[in-house]
């Protein structure tokens, strides 16, 4: 834990009390954080202490990395961006009740501050004003043990070196240690109470002797001690309960943070699933593809009206379809057209609007295309392309198609 409220951030860094996992924030020479880092003209950095050794009497007076000449600290500059990033880093409070012995991290039994997320730039303010676990040196004696900042009142009630007045009202003021001895020594404490012996040689005018007054004073002292012990127990129990509540609050906050992270993860997963569902929806209502027919011209020589050159089968959702191409028309009524026939083989029985788009290359002369849809056994001509395509000398035929299923609007 940190001792002495006058501690500075520079001391904390130089004592190695802060460890940063990112090596970019640590000095390449001493490995301590670059609290007061400086860099040469070429951007190579180190902490101020290491630079002072480099330019010192026995130093090489050159950059440890690029060997550029460094005669004084005036030849160096600050990396303000890096300094700002370092001070943004979050660390645990130094009063966390943990100490490191070698490579072993030991959690001390007296506990400590639970804060784990303090920006370095706010660390000193937290330690001095918020934490309560700062170790304070007793101002009454160097022989007295230090105490935690949150235990100031308890320490003042118990410190054996603190000056107090005698509770028996004798007027004596001394350290608590000496006052206790004073009270325990017979006849050493004489209360400042006027005693009148005019009517009674062994007492005052009211018949109360000195011994009774001393007994009364001692009773008052015992009552005060008992009261202080009860107050001490109440404070100890209260501190224990407060510490337990702080622990519970810390772990609750940690759990909330974990739950928030889980919520964000679930949101990402939901977004991914939603995207996948949308893609599945697209695949269930639409299908596009390309049909390539090599040796197109040779195949035309052996075909006539009503003969198809190719059949392509595919699924859209649970519906199975086929596409057939009739170079000379699927019937004599359609002779002179290239018929592209879309038919449904099986699937769900419901009415659909079918959108079929094709583009064909590979004919020697200009032709029109007739698109037919066969939902069952009867053909329905759904579109007739009026546009034509340019003559191609290729010996292959390419058909690009896209089929969209849309529910009919009644």
Curated annotation (Swiss-Prot):
**What family is this?**
Belongs to the TNF receptor-associated factor family.
- What does the entry's domain section say? The MATH/TRAF domain binds to receptor cytoplasmic domains.
Zinc finger RING-type: from-to: 27-67
Q: Which residues form a coiled coil?
A: 216-284
Instruction: Mention any Pfam family matching this sequence.
Output: Cep57_MT_bd
GO molecular-function terms, A-Z: microtubule binding; zinc ion binding
Task: State where the protein is found.
Answer: Cytoplasm
Assigned keywords, A-Z: Coiled coil, Cytoplasm, Metal-binding, Repeat, Zinc, Zinc-finger
Q: What does this protein do?
A: Probable adapter protein and signal transducer that links members of the tumor necrosis factor receptor family to different signaling pathways by association with the receptor cytoplasmic domain and kinases.
Q: Where are the zinc fingers (TRAF-type)?
A: 81-154, 154-213
The protein depicted here goes by the name TNF receptor-associated factor family protein DDB_G0279745
Alphabetical GO CC annotations of the entry are: cytoplasm
Where are the bilayer-spanning segments?
Answer: none
Q: Which PANTHER family match?
A: RING-TYPE DOMAIN-CONTAINING PROTEIN-RELATED (PTHR10131:SF156), TNF RECEPTOR ASSOCIATED FACTOR (PTHR10131)
């Amino acid at each position: 834990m940190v001792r002495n409220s006058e501690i500075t951030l520079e001391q904390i860094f130089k004592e190695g009390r802060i460890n940063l996992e990112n090596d970019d924030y640590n000095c390449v020479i001493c490995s301590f954080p670059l609290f007061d880092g400086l860099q040469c003209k070429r951007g190579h950095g180190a902490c101020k202490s290491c630079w002072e050794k480099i330019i010192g009497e026995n130093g090489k007076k050159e950059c440890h990395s690029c060997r550029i000449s460094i005669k004084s600290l005036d030849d160096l500059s600050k990396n303000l961006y890096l300094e700002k990033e370092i001070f943004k880093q979050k660390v645990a409070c130094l009063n966390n009740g943990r100490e490191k012995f070698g490579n072993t991290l030991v959690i001390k039994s007296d506990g400590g501050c639970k804060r784990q997320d303090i920006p370095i730039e706010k660390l000193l303010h937290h330690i001095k004003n918020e934490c309560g676990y700062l170790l304070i040196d007793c101002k009454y004696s160097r022989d007295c043990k230090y105490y935690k900042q949150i235990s100031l009142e308890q320490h003042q009630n118990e410190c054996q070196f603190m000056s107090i007045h005698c509770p028996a009202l004798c007027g004596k003021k001394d350290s608590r240690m000496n006052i206790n001895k004073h009270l325990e020594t017979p006849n050493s404490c004489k209360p400042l109470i006027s005693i009148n012996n005019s009517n009674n040689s062994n007492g005052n005018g009211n018949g109360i002797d000195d011994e009774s007054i001393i007994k009364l004073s001692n009773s008052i002292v015992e009552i005060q001690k008992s009261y202080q012990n009860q107050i001490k127990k109440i404070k100890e129990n209260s501190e224990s309960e407060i510490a337990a509540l702080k622990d519970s609050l810390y772990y609750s906050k940690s759990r909330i943070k974990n739950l928030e992270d889980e919520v964000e993860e679930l949101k990402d997963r939901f977004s991914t699933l939603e995207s996948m569902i949308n893609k599945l929806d697209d695949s269930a209502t639409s299908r596009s593809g390309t049909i390539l027919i090599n040796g197109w011209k040779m195949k035309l020589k052996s075909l006539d009206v009503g003969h198809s050159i190719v059949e392509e089968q595919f699924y859209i959702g649970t519906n199975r379809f086929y596409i057939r191409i009739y170079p000379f028309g699927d019937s004599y009524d359609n002779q002179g057209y290239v018929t592209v026939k879309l038919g449904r083989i099986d699937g769900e029985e419901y009415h659909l609007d079918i959108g079929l788009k094709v583009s064909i290359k590979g004919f020697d002369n200009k032709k029109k295309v007739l698109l037919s849809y066969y939902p069952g056994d009867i053909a329905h001509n759904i579109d007739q392309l009026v546009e034509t395509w340019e003559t191609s000398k290729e010996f292959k035929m390419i058909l690009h198609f896209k089929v969209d299923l849309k529910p009919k609007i009644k």
